[in-house]
Swiss-Prot record:
This is Co-chaperonin GroES. It comes from the Bacteria. One of its GO terms (molecular function) is unfolded protein binding. The keyword Zinc does not apply. Together with the chaperonin GroEL, plays an essential role in assisting protein folding. The GroEL-GroES system forms a nano-cage that allows encapsulation of the non-native substrate proteins and provides a physical environment optimized to promote and accelerate protein folding. GroES binds to the apical surface of the GroEL ring, thereby capping the opening of the GroEL channel. GO terms for cellular component: cytoplasm. Its main location: cytoplasm. It is found in: Cytoplasm. NCBIfam families: PRK00364.1-2, PRK00364.1-6, PRK00364.2-2, PRK00364.2-4, PRK00364.2-5. Keywords: Chaperone, Cytoplasm.
Length: 98
């Protein structure tokens, strides 16, 4: 998937994954009652930030990784009819290993 957003420094562009629409017992959860997703697929990464010595520190995730991120982190962006979240690398809590 090609994204028209090029993140800077240690920023990451994530496509949020859809939240479950039903409960385990089969009840449908309306959009107004659903929590924001905290899991998404990385679609673009920045080159990394510079440390105090001027060395570039690479980002720990790669394009295609599924990550769990901070609930209130990032900035929501819409482009090309799709919704994305631009996060700082510090807002990523974990990589989901399947």
């Amino acid at each position: 998937m090609s994204v028209s957003i090029k993140p800077l420094e240690d920023r990451i562009v994530v496509r949020p994954l859809e939240a479950e629409q039903t409960t385990a017992s089969g009840l449908v959860i309306p959009d107004s009652a659903q929590e924001k997703p905290q899991e998404g697929e990385v679609v673009a990464i920045g080159p990394g930030r510079f440390d105090d010595n001027g060395n570039r520190v690479p980002v720990d995730v790669a394009v295609g990784d599924v990550v769990i991120y901070s609930k209130y982190g990032g900035t929501e962006v819409k482009t090309g009819g799709n919704e994305y979240l631009v996060l700082s690398a510090r807002d990523v809590l974990a990589i989901v290993v399947k």
